[in-house]
């Protein structure tokens, strides 16, 4: 399963639902884009260290953006940016999940609902 950035943020904030979801999956993966978004949102060196520890200790596979994912994301932007407001990071994350034939766990299912061939698992945090 690919985890969207929001699920990871909830996990790092101590949300039990996010922890259960992540821990229940034997194949845990995130797009390199999500790792970048987490690091970009860090407010201190300590938070950066926490993010790195989380990725290592959770046995989460980082999926790089390759040529195939880039081309799929480009077509998703073309198809969904105007009508649905699909943004670049979400297109790359969706393309990563679709190319890997993995479901995408996200609290923002509406961002991805129009994308054919993408299995979306809606996530709802305990705190939300």
Predicted regions and their residues:
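Short, structured coil segments at secondary-structure junctions
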Residues: 24-25, 58, 115-116
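Short, well-structured N-terminal submotif of metal-dependent ribonuclease cores
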Residues: 1-30, 40-53, 127-128
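Active-site neighborhoods of divalent-metal-dependent phosphate/nucleic-acid chemistry enzymes
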Residues: 60-107
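Acidic, PIN/NYN-like endoribonuclease modules and their adjacent C-terminal/linker elements
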Residues: 99-128
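Amphipathic alpha-helical segments within well-ordered protein domains
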Residues: 36-39, 74
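Generic structural signal for small/hydrophobic residues in well-ordered secondary structure
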Residues: 4-5, 38, 97, 112
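Alpha-helix capping/helix-boundary segments
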Residues: 7-8, 34, 69, 92-93, ...
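Nucleotide phosphate-binding site architecture
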Residues: 8-9, 39, 113, 121
């Amino acid at each position: 399963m690919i985890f969207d950035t929001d699920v990871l943020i909830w996990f790092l904030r101590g949300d039990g639902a996010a922890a259960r979801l992540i821990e229940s999956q034997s194949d845990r993966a995130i797009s390199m884009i999500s790792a970048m978004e987490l690091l970009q949102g860090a407010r201190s060196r300590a938070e950066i260290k926490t993010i790195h520890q989380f990725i290592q200790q959770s046995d989460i596979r980082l999926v790089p953006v390759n040529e195939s994912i880039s081309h799929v994301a480009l077509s998703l932007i073309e198809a969904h940016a105007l009508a649905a407001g699909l943004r670049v990071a979400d297109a790359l994350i969706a393309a990563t999940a679709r190319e890997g034939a993995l479901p995408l766990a996200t609290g923002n299912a509406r961002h991805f609902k129009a994308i054919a061939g993408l299995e979306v698992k809606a996530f709802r945090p305990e705190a939300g």
